Structures are given as structure tokens and as C-alpha cells.
């Protein structure tokens, strides 16, 4: 599908020259599609409003900031550089419901996702998505256990 729309595939050099916010822009959309697909696969008979609320738990800036902090140790050198470029790029938009630090971390995360997507690194993208989903599921289980012990 990408090849049809892009014509030519992007090279690493092309992406190094691209504004990191452009990579984050596409990364935001790619990440959301992955997460929505995951949420739907686990909640087939749920109304759209509830699906949206579950999706927000993954896509809000503080969640993305948490995920990138946790998975950073699994990123290779190139991905770390891409992340830092995205995180450190000055943006004209501001965080609505997040700290500046979380917003920048989330932008770095989305930059990595966009970079991998435009390079057609689908296997690597899936590995990162699995790490994120596993982190979410672990934190949800821990939250449930903590709530259970309070009563």
C-alpha cells in the first residue's frame, strides 16, 4: 500500500533530512491505527465510545512518554538518534493535557514509529508495538491487583 502512494521508497538518508515533526505526524497516525486494531481485537462487541476511551489510555502523551521510557533500552543506536531528534525538535504546538516533558517524549516516540513505518521496517515496528502492548497489559494487571488489595 505504501509503495502505491509513495511511488519510491524512502531511504535512511531521505528520512534523516526530513523534519522530525513530519515523522512524528505520520508516526502518530500509524501508532493510533495499531492501537485501535489491538483494542478492537480484544473488545469486538464494545461500543465505539468505550473503544475510544480504551484507545486514549495508549495514545495520550503521558502514556507514550511512559512507554518510550520503558522500551528505550530495546531501541538500537539509530532508533535512539531518531527518538532524540524528535524529542528535541521545537514544536509550535503545545501539550494540551500533558507536561512539556511528556509531550516531547511522546513526540520522540512518534518520530521513531514514523521513521520505521516510512522505511518499511514492519517487523521492527511490530516488535515495538508488542513491547508497548505488553507494558500496558502488565500495568493494567498491576493496577487491578493494587485495587483489589485496597478493599
Curated annotation (Swiss-Prot):
Lineage top rank: taxon: Bacteria
One Pfam family cited in the UniProt record for this chain: Ribonuclease_3
Enzyme class: hydrolase
Active site: 28
Subunit and interaction comment: Homodimer.
PANTHER family reported for this sequence: MINI-RIBONUCLEASE 3
Protein name as it appears in the record: Mini-ribonuclease 3
Gene source species: Clostridium tetani (strain Massachusetts / E88)
Phylogenetic classification of the source organism: Bacteria, Bacillati, Bacillota, Clostridia, Eubacteriales
Gene label: mrnC
Amino acid at each position: 500500500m505504501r509503495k502505491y502512494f509513495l511511488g519510491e521508497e524512502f531511504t535512511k538518508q531521505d528520512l534523516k533530512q526530513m523534519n522530525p515533526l513530519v515523522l512524528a505526524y505520520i508516526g502518530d497516525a500509524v501508532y493510533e491505527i495499531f492501537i485501535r486494531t489491538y483494542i478492537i481485537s480484544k473488545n469486538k462487541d464494545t461500543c465505539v465510545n468505550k473503544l475510544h476511551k480504551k484507545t486514549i489510555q495508549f495514545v495520550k502523551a503521558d502514556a507514550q512518554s511512559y512507554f518510550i521510557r520503558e522500551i528505550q533500552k530495546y531501541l538500537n543506536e539509530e532508533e535512539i538518534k531518531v527518538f532524540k531528534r524528535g524529542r528535541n525538535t521545537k514544536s509550535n504546538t503545545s501539550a494540551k493535557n500533558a507536561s512539556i516533558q511528556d509531550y516531547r517524549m511522546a513526540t520522540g516516540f512518534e518520530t521513531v514509529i514514523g521513521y520505521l513505518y516510512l522505511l518499511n521496517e514492519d517487523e521492527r515496528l511490530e516488535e515495538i508495538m508488542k513491547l508497548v502492548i505488553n507494558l500496558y497489559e502488565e500495568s493494567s494487571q498491576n493496577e487491578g491487583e493494587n485495587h483489589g488489595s485496597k478493599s
